[in-house]
Amino acid sequence: MAIDPQPSSPSLSSETIANDTIGNDNNVNEPSVEPKTQEHQHTVPPRLSRIYSQAHHISKSFIDQNYPGEGTTQAPYRINFLPDDSQNAQLLPRWKKWAFVLLQSLACLATTFASSAYSGGIKQIIRAFGISQEVATLGISLYVLGFTFGPLVWAPLSELYGRKKVFFFTFMVATAFSAGAAGAGSIASLLVLRFLTGSIGSAPLSNAPALIADMFDKSERGLAMCMFSGAPFLGPAIGPIAGGFLGETAGWRWLHGLMAAFTGVTWIACTVFIPETYAPYILRKRAQHMSKLTGKVYISTLDADKPPSSAAHQLKNALTRPWLLLFKEPIVFITSIYISIIYGTMYMCFAAFPIVFQQGRGWSQGIGGLAFTGIVIGVILSIISFAFEDKRYARAARSRGAPMEPEDRLPPAIMGSLLIPIGLFWFAWTTFPSIHWIVPIIGTVFFAWGLVLVFMALLNYLIDSYVIFAASIMAANSALRSLFGAAFPLFTRQMYDGLGVQWASSIPAFLALACVPFPFLFYKYGRQIRMKCEYAAEAANVLQKMRSLHVAVTEDDAMNEAEEMWRARTHNSHASAAHSHGHRRSLSYTRSA
């Protein structure tokens, strides 16, 4: 098994995660597909033969297969990928897979880069529109607030309409809005465009991890996810470095032009080179087009035993289910709060560093952006650390010869939980101008190192704990941490003015220190806690069922089963209470008589 960190929220479909747990992605209990014998060949109109190699990638070899079924409405042919299917993303050459991971990581980097690069032009925006520091900072907060809503919508839509279509349209619109922000004539229009760009452009935050899950099996996915997971943290760290110099020399409009250019180039590159990778969508469209070509009825094996699901139904679940799990499951709530605090602290740095280094040490706007170099180094160290952790976990899984427990994911979080307060206190109390500037920046290295270790390890822990509910768990975590990331920069200026640099910088350090026990407690008592959590216990039951019976279970199925069990327990408890109350009344009547 491999480490499977996911920085964004609803990124992996429940089907992908569930099927990974039993070691089979798309072929659960399905008969093998063999070439049709002559008597089973379909008769296809000659005028359609030229379409095979052009329309929808339907080749004659797809038709001439002996699929299970009879080709009728009652018993449709159940199609799956062929053994050497060129559209099966799992069979792509390794160099292509890594190239696609790199491109999607760049798209994610472009999105998160734009969230913080804006800070490099805040001084010019304040002068241009005559506004306060807090109003100008809304440009960061509203952009990050868009991360709360965007992935909740784009993740389910990518499962209905494919990864490629969703990425194409969302990043195209995000590029247009980013370019529009460069020409904004008022602060209101600038802030609205920033929010829309963050909401619509956040598709890669859910698309990229899903694309990795489409292409790599679980044994290979760890390294790919380690490579990708740096993008959501490197982007915000690099943004102020580039933005500070460009904003200082060319102005804030050119800075937004750079964001639009970065987004536009990655949009073109990903659109041109990355194919559709989501297997259920590919097979669903293939079945539809084969039905049109032959007059027979085809259906994807991945859709055969599932009721049809509309976009409205999936969006409703995507918008409501994460919040249900967030507030009903203690593990989800506590880990999400912890991740949100440290994630918000990272975005607080974009308002705090100008106070500490530009205002406190007299650095220029461009040089002030270089203070984020420590965070960049810390993120890189965490990625290297997780590459080694991935190998350690894989060795432990092989030597055990049995499924690993979710708590086995937590050692990096334990280490990271110690590094975060160490780094934050180090930074807070070495910000005096009399102390060399490199000393507080070294503190930010430890903070960023610990931040990514905790982030990735806790997300892995949640995925392994909830398995079939993982997509909704990731959505809940993503939404909450984005709210914290949007809120923290807004009160930073007042906090630093009221408390002073050292004590204001210590506030997030104390919060992180209060969270240190959580990874230790989950590591020691996590199993007992999970068994007392309704949905975690149901996820464990579903996982056991999939391993023993080799059946695929969807998130909807598991949610329905959990809700039925909850209703049954509630009914039984009410019935028991009513019976007990009636029994007491009977005894009282007897005594009265």
Curated annotation (Swiss-Prot):
<feature type="transmembrane region" description="Helical">
    <location>
        <begin position="337"/>
        <end position="357"/>
    </location>
</feature>
<keyword id="KW-1133">Transmembrane helix</keyword>
<feature type="transmembrane region" description="Helical">
    <location>
        <begin position="503"/>
        <end position="523"/>
    </location>
</feature>
<feature type="glycosylation site" description="N-linked (GlcNAc...) asparagine">
    <location>
        <position position="19"/>
    </location>
</feature>
<keyword id="KW-0812">Transmembrane</keyword>
<feature type="transmembrane region" description="Helical">
    <location>
        <begin position="438"/>
        <end position="458"/>
    </location>
</feature>
<feature type="region of interest" description="Disordered">
    <location>
        <begin position="570"/>
        <end position="593"/>
    </location>
</feature>
<dbReference type="InterPro" id="IPR011701">
    <property type="entry name" value="MFS"/>
</dbReference>
<feature type="transmembrane region" description="Helical">
    <location>
        <begin position="195"/>
        <end position="215"/>
    </location>
</feature>
<dbReference type="Pfam" id="PF07690">
    <property type="entry name" value="MFS_1"/>
</dbReference>
<dbReference type="GO" id="GO:0005886">
    <property type="term" value="C:plasma membrane"/>
</dbReference>
<feature type="compositionally biased region" description="Polar residues">
    <location>
        <begin position="9"/>
        <end position="30"/>
    </location>
</feature>
<feature type="transmembrane region" description="Helical">
    <location>
        <begin position="410"/>
        <end position="430"/>
    </location>
</feature>
<protein>
    <recommendedName>
        <fullName>Efflux pump FUB11</fullName>
    </recommendedName>
</protein>
<feature type="transmembrane region" description="Helical">
    <location>
        <begin position="227"/>
        <end position="247"/>
    </location>
</feature>
<feature type="transmembrane region" description="Helical">
    <location>
        <begin position="135"/>
        <end position="155"/>
    </location>
</feature>
<dbReference type="InterPro" id="IPR036259">
    <property type="entry name" value="MFS_trans_sf"/>
</dbReference>
<comment type="function">
    <text>Efflux pump involved in export of fusaric acid, a mycotoxin with low to moderate toxicity to animals and humans, but with high phytotoxic properties. Constitutes a self-protecting mechanism of the fungus against critical levels of FSA within the cell.</text>
</comment>
<keyword id="KW-0472">Membrane</keyword>
<keyword id="KW-0325">Glycoprotein</keyword>
<feature type="transmembrane region" description="Helical">
    <location>
        <begin position="468"/>
        <end position="488"/>
    </location>
</feature>
<dbReference type="InterPro" id="IPR020846">
    <property type="entry name" value="MFS_dom"/>
</dbReference>
<keyword id="KW-1003">Cell membrane</keyword>
<comment type="similarity">
    <text>Belongs to the major facilitator superfamily. DHA1 family. Polyamines/proton antiporter (TC 2.A.1.2.16) subfamily.</text>
</comment>
<keyword id="KW-0813">Transport</keyword>
<feature type="transmembrane region" description="Helical">
    <location>
        <begin position="254"/>
        <end position="274"/>
    </location>
</feature>
<feature type="transmembrane region" description="Helical">
    <location>
        <begin position="167"/>
        <end position="187"/>
    </location>
</feature>
<feature type="transmembrane region" description="Helical">
    <location>
        <begin position="98"/>
        <end position="118"/>
    </location>
</feature>
<feature type="region of interest" description="Disordered">
    <location>
        <begin position="1"/>
        <end position="45"/>
    </location>
</feature>
<dbReference type="GO" id="GO:0022857">
    <property type="term" value="F:transmembrane transporter activity"/>
</dbReference>
<feature type="transmembrane region" description="Helical">
    <location>
        <begin position="367"/>
        <end position="387"/>
    </location>
</feature>
